[in-house]
């Protein structure tokens, strides 16, 4: 008689996904855009069965430097604590309008194993060709 060991199937772990959104002013007309962005990302992440929503991080600031944005800093701390796998952001300009910050943080997140997806530009930082394109688009975002 041959005894065969049957291993239970373990489903793959869900990707821990966060979103980052930002409006550049505190004016009332921006409130609707801000709330719409948050709702959109909650629904988008929940629509992927292999994704788990961690949080939608958000800032209502026009600060160009990420060190002045508490939502961004909270997201960075979560990444450093190994609580995130993917960050989704509408565009490079929402992530950072400062070219140096954009490139440094994109590389830093990647060293932590966190992929950033910039929706409008269709860029993923886990793509090895993204650095060149990201540097050009970050420069454009800085001049906007």
For each predicted feature, which ranges?
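Short, structured surface patches at the beginning of a domain
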Residues: 1-144
């Amino acid at each position: 008689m041959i005894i065969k060991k049957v291993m239970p199937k373990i489903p793959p772990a869900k990707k821990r996904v966060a979103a980052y959104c930002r409006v550049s002013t505190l004016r009332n007309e921006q409130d609707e855009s801000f709330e719409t962005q948050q709702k959109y990302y909650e629904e988008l992440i929940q629509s992927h069965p292999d994704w788990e929503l961690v949080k939608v991080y958000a800032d209502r600031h026009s600060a160009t430097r990420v060190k002045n944005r508490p939502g961004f800093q909270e997201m960075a701390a979560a990444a450093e604590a190994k609580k995130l796998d993917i960050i989704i952001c509408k565009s490079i300009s929402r992530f950072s309008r400062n070219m140096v910050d954009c490139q440094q943080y994109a590389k830093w997140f990647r060293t932590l194993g966190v992929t950033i997806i910039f929706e409008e530009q269709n860029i993923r930082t886990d793509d090895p060709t993204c650095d060149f394109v990201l540097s050009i688009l970050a420069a454009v975002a800085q001049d906007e």
